[in-house]
Amino acid sequence: MLPRFILILSALPIAAAMAARWWFGMRVLAENGGRPCKCDLARWVPEDGEAVQKAEESAHEFGRQLRLKALAEWQETDPKAAKSRASSKRFGTAVPPISGIVAVMAVMVAKIPVMGAIAAILAATALSAVVGILSLTPELAAINRAARKLREARSFPRRDDEEAVIRCAMAHAWKETLPPILALIHR
């Protein structure tokens, strides 16, 4: 009875996280990611002389670059919060596989039933998904700060391109918030 309750209780946050990833990440990238955008490289490339980039790319690629710039700036301005977000991502990467290994070994030595092992794996995955979603807010705030700077710099001649790039940057953050085991399932 308890494993079934845990299965149901774990399925809800997993389904909610997958739905949020699709709605705020995958759907937005599908709608806006293919848009060809043109930027002014003198305003787009940061002062530290990053690798040379193309002036014409898709909104998907510019969004990815904007997110990476935002994360780098965030690392400099608030390293404690950035490390916390990175730790939550590592938690989501490590906990489901480790719980799977422990559950399989527990089944092999006949300490828990198979249904209990499946429930434990799903519970660990649900916990990882919840931690990933809850720790996403500071990253989105960092992307918002970078987007504000992007708007002030007027890196994109067309406002529509700029908005598509910002939406794609936010979508990349949502896309990468799930634990990798769920990201493999939810392509």
Where do the protein language model's features map onto the residues?
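Hydrophobic alpha-helical transmembrane segments
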Residues: 1-11, 109-124
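Polar-ligand-bearing catalytic/cofactor-coordination segments
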Residues: 2-95, 133-187
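Alpha-helical transmembrane segments and their immediate juxtamembrane boundary regions
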Residues: 89-111, 119-129
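Alpha-helical transmembrane segments and their immediate juxtamembrane interface regions
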Residues: 114-144
